[in-house]
């Protein structure tokens, strides 16, 4: 006799399941169990993987969930098929919303009034209907019936059992457990008696939370994390023993020998169930064409209409390409998908929302003619099969970047068009990585939070929870940190056990899922923190379910571009010419800070060596500075051949037209496809399969099989076998490093145009870029330093001149020096006559409401004083924002003593409160002419008046400076390094600007603030650290090789990062200047 576990939790129970899903399935298969259920708490996130892996193991998957009901009771539910699964989704959704979902087209699902979205609770009324296809088990000790029995309320338990039996006629079982808990045997016998009295069947489960008894500690620890308790503290939800494991059938049979029918019923229930998911479904929404025509016909009409607008004259070459693509699209049945994406982009463009398609979709001429992408695939000779092919028959994936500020408008349009019951955000699973595991598990284990914080901050952010020992051995900042690793040994071991376990569900930044059928038939829905409706599957699983995923991504660069273009006024961004010599000249000296995709130190170094003078150079730049090409040693051959220092050769004449534009180097994935097509006669779809085998590092058998096929086909095409073998080895070496050319071209377009804005409109562009933070590679002060270097001033926040965001003003050095008594930073470029004014919201603590209230009041004229502002805003600006503005210097033109102004804030707000209480007639209260208001008012008035302000000494210059920097992230009036420059100059330290004039090999000393240290992968596998030092003249890049890094790594990767001083030799490569570091130390300040 066998047995089936019907109550099983995986890590998708979010901190209440301690064994990986694959391990649970393997354990069930090991013991010959015919089926296995998955019943995670209030979700089915593991359903797709569970069904796939169980079927692969020869086990029947039973999908269910443990539902939390109102009152906190638990109920185990199992779906017998797709209909039951849909009803299960409805009930889980009701639990997350606190009420039954009642979505109507154009309306969102809503939380019940007063319901906490983090505390699922399904109303009992939701169980009273539409439960077909669901089997219900009475649950664990937290089920309503067992809970009532344990409290001696037997009559109420019987009434509850009658209710459930009525809600699930012929499908309700009383659930027995044996977890060796007090009162358990009595409970089981009471349940048996109740079953006999009401004619209800029994079933046994093990309430599984971990695979083996040895994993109990992990389960207990995760429970402590979930309940915010320490392992030395009791909590009613903590397990008392290790009995919630996946017991072998013989153990279950032995333990329940008193209840043989209950054991048999596990098999009977399994026989009633079948897989609930159709993983071959096509749930794409049908696009309703405006003229009622077939979607394929309408798509063809739109494509040719767009082609006429793109090309003017549609040549035979264009027509053949479009027909080829349309044939593949329609044969695969994706015409509705293309129309859906076209419609979304059309909506955005009609409303002036900047957007652009990217990724392999730019390989499509159809996408270009639909204005989804701006890359001409025909002109560039891009292969559609890199995007879609009949052989691969995979769903197309079109990523679209939108202005970050307005992306939600586009998403709202999708909800309106397809209905709230057909659209939801894709979820993400926030998983345990090293830092989160250290913090969460360590706190539960009783470590001091300061110790955990110290440890977590020193672990690289990208390290997995099972890589802590690896990074400790590899990185000196961990080895030399003084961390007593023996103290954390058990914590590190626990972290390894929970690596990549999901902690909670999050919201995908841009993914929307759209379904032809109501989504509740496919997935439960729940509410995210910001009000979005989120499905319970991530981007991988929604595609497995046959749903359309629409990637509406937010790109802050577009926000900056849009602001800059509006500030400039007389520029057509779309028509910026690709041949501007001044832009290429700027890039050619490595001055690309602020340029999309080209601003990292590696890119700046590449630009200075590449000396780009054409758009194709930008496309190559985007593709080549990636971990793969760098590890594959593609950069040096490409540069040498680009500048004629190395001969360009081809293994076969057929390779020349393919590789000519990249100087014989396989740089793009599309080139691999073209080579296989030209040399071996592969169809484009077959060639893409070859690329995918190579790119994704498939197993040796796959590689050998595709290699044999390549050689056979090449020989049949007349290629010498030895040459064919060499070509295959050649592309095999490069294919895994290649980048998608279409994606590179799409990004290169934005890269070039933003470079044009940096070169010709630095004030407007950097102001917009600073307003759009956080984004890009550098902190905001680095952007400000670069703007100043380009002759653009930086003006402090001013209560009468600042707008909400950063803005551009006319400016002169003379006016600055006259007011501030110091000269601004010395620019390398001629002064532009313009300056960037810091916006109100750039000050930490000043949110949109406060800034809006200030600007609305200022419409009536400039503020005369702090008191005037408080009176005219009616006290709408709270104390926190006002004090932040004072400390940031926003009132300096009105109040020279910041400390005195700070004193007045609270008293002025109190006086304004009194004024409002006494009525609008007391308008003069803050001006001191409202007699007879009482002692409290008089006291407030006196304190708020200039006469009532005590004689307080103002902050010192250093204090003012540090507060400005703390609140804005900007060094406004001077740079920190200017405070120590005189001393450093005496000691022989150079500025970044001076280093750029020194000869290669010269030994120099530099100092500055460290910016963006990073350790990219290298071909050798050794660690090389790149970072920049920022001073008042700009950035100087440092290269730190492994031997030096091993000595000084503890100074680099710290939080916060202190100023550093470095000794090293000047390195000149092309036009790029950097320093190879010999010694590093903390800068004495």
From Swiss-Prot:
It catalyses: DNA(n) + a 2'-deoxyribonucleoside 5'-triphosphate = DNA(n+1) + diphosphate. GO terms for molecular function: 3'-5' exonuclease activity; DNA-directed DNA polymerase activity. Its main location: cytoplasm. Its EC number is 2.7.7.7. It is found in: Cytoplasm. Keywords: Cytoplasm, DNA damage, DNA repair, DNA replication, DNA-directed DNA polymerase, Nucleotidyltransferase, Transferase. It is an enzyme of class 2 (transferase). The keyword Nucleotide-binding does not apply. InterPro entries: DNA_pol3_alpha_NTPase_dom, DNA_pol3_alpha_thumb_dom, DNA_pol3_finger, DnaE2, DnaE2/DnaE/PolC, DNAPol_HHH, PHP_dom, Pol/His_phosphatase_N. One of its GO terms (biological process) is DNA replication. DNA polymerase involved in damage-induced mutagenesis and translesion synthesis (TLS). It is not the major replicative DNA polymerase. Belongs to the DNA polymerase type-C family. DnaE2 subfamily. This is Error-prone DNA polymerase. The lineage of its organism: Bacteria, Bacillati, Bacillota, Clostridia, Eubacteriales.
């Amino acid at each position: 006799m066998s047995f089936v576990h019907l109550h099983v939790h995986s890590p998708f129970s979010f901190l209440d399941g301690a064994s990986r899903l694959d391990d649970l399935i393997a354990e069930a298969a090991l013991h010959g169990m015919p089926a296995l259920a998955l019943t995670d708490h209030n979700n089915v996130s593991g359903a797709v993987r569970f069904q796939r892996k169980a079927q692969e193991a020869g086990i029947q998957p039973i999908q269910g969930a443990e539902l939390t009901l109102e009152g906190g009771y638990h109920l185990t539910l199992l779906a017998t098929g797709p209909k039951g699964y849909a009803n299960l989704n409805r009930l889980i959704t009701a639990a997350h919303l606190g009420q039954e979902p009642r979505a109507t087209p154009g309306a969102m699902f809503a939380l019940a009034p007063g319901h906490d979205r983090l505390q699922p609770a399904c109303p009992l009324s939701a169980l009273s209907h539409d439960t077909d296809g669901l089997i219900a088990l009475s649950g664990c000790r937290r089920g309503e019936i067992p809970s009532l029995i344990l409290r001696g309320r037997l009559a109420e338990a019987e009434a509850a059992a009658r209710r459930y039996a009525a809600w699930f006629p012929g499908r309700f079982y009383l659930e027995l457990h044996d977890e060796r808990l007090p009162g358990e045997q009595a409970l089981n016998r009471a349940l048996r008696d109740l079953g006999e009295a009401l004619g209800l069947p029994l079933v046994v489960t093990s309430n599984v939370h971990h695979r083996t008894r040895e994993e109990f500690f992990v389960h207990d620890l995760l429970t402590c994390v979930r309940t915010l308790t320490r392992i030395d503290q009791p909590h009613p939800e903590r397990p008392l023993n290790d009995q919630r494991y996946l017991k072998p059938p013989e153990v279950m049979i032995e333990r329940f020998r008193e209840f043989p029918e209950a054991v048999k019923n596990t098999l009977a229930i399994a026989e009633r169930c079948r897989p609930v998911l159709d993983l071959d479904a096509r749930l794409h929404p049908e696009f309703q064409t405006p003229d009622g025509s077939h979607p394929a016909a309408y798509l063809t009409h739109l494509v040719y209409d767009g082609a006429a607008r793109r090309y003017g004259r549609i040549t035979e070459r264009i027509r053949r390409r479009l027909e080829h693509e349309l044939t593949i699209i329609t044969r695969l049945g994706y015409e509705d998908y293309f129309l859906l994406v076209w419609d979304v982009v059309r909506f955005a463009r009609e409303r002036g929302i900047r957007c652009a398609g990217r990724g392999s979709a730019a390989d499509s001429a159809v996408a270009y003619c639909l204005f989804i992408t701006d890359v001409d695939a025909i002109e560039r000779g891009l292969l559609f099969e890199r995007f879609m092919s009949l052989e691969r028959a995979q769903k197309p994936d079109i990523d679209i970047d939108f202005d970050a500020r307005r992306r939600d408008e586009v998403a709202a349009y999708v909800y309106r068009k397809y209905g709230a019951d057909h659209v939801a955000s894709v979820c993400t699973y926030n998983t345990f990585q090293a830092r989160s595991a250290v913090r969460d598990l360590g706190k539960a284990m009783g470590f001091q939070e300061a110790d955990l914080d110290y440890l977590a901050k020193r672990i690289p952010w990208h390290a997995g929870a099972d890589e802590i020992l690896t990074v400790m051995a590899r990185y000196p900042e961990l080895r030399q940190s003084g961390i007593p690793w023996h103290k954390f040994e058990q914590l590190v071991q626990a972290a390894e056990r929970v690596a990549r376990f999901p902690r909670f569900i999050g919201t995908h930044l841009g993914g929307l899922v759209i379904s032809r059928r109501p989504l509740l038939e496919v997935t439960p829905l729940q509410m995210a923190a910001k009000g979005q409706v989120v499905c319970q599957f991530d981007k991988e699983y929604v595609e497995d379910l046959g749903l359309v995923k629409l990637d509406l991504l937010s790109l802050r660069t577009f926000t900056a571009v849009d602001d800059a273009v509006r500030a400039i006024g007389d520029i057509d961004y779309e028509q910026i010419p690709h041949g501007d010599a001044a832009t290429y000249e700027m890039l050619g000296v490595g001055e690309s800070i602020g340029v999309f995709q080209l601003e990292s130190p590696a890119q700046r170094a590449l630009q200075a060596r590449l000396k780009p003078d054409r758009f194709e150079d930008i496309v190559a730049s985007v593709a080549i500075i990636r971990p793969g090409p760098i590890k594959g040693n593609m950069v040096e051959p490409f540069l040498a051949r680009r500048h004629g220092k190395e001969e360009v050769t081809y293994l076969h004449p057929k390779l020349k037209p393919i590789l000519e534009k990249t100087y014989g180097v396989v740089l793009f994935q599309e080139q691999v496809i073209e080579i296989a097509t030209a040399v071996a006669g592969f169809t484009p779809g077959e060639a893409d399969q070859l690329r995918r085998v190579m790119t994704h590092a498939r197993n040796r058998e796959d590689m050998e099989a595709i290699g044999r096929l390549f050689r056979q086909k090449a020989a049949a095409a007349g290629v010498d076998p030895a040459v064919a073998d060499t070509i295959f080895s050649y592309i095999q070496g490069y294919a895994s490093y290649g980048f998608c050319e279409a994606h590179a071209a799409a990004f290169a377009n934005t890269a070039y145009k933003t470079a044009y804005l940096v070169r010709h409109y630095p004030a407007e562009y950097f102001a917009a870029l600073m307003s759009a933070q956080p984004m890009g590679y550098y902190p905001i002060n680095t952007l400000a330093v670069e703007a100043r270097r380009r002759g653009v001033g930086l003006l402090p926040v001013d209560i009468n001149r600042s707008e909400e965001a950063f803005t551009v003003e006319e400016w002169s050095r003379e006016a600055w020096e006259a007011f501030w008594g110091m000269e601004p930073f010395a620019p390398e470029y001629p002064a532009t006559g313009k300056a960037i004014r810091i916006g109100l919201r750039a000050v930490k603590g000043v949110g949109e409401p406060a800034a809006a209230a200030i600007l609305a009041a200022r419409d009536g004229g400039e503020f005369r004083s702090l008191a005037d502002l408080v009176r005219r805003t009616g006290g709408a600006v709270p104390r926190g924002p006002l004090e932040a503005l004072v400390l940031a210097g926003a009132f300096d033109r009105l109040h020279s003593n910041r400390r005195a102004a700070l004193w007045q804030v609270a008293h002025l707000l109190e006086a304004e409160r009194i004024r409002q209480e006494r009525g609008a007639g007391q308008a003069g209260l803050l001006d001191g002419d409202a007699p007879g208001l009482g002692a409290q008012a008089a006291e407030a008035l006196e304190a708020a008046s200039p006469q009532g302000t005590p004689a307080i000494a103002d902050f010192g210059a250093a204090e003012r400076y540090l507060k400005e920097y703390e609140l804005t992230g900007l060094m406004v009036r001077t740079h920190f390094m200017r405070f120590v420059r005189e001393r450093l100059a005496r000691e022989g330290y150079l500025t970044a600007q001076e280093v750029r004039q020194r000869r290669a090999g010269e030994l120099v000393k530099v100092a500055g603030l460290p910016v963006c240290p990073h350790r990219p992968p290298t071909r050798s596998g050794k660690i090389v650290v790149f970072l920049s030092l920022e001073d008042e003249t700009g950035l100087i890049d440092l290269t730190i090789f492994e031997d030096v890094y091993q000595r000084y790594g503890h100074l680099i990767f710290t939080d916060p990062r202190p100023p550093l001083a470095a000794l090293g030799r000047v390195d000149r490569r092309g036009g790029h200047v950097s320093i190879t570091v010999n010694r590093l130390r903390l800068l004495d300040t």
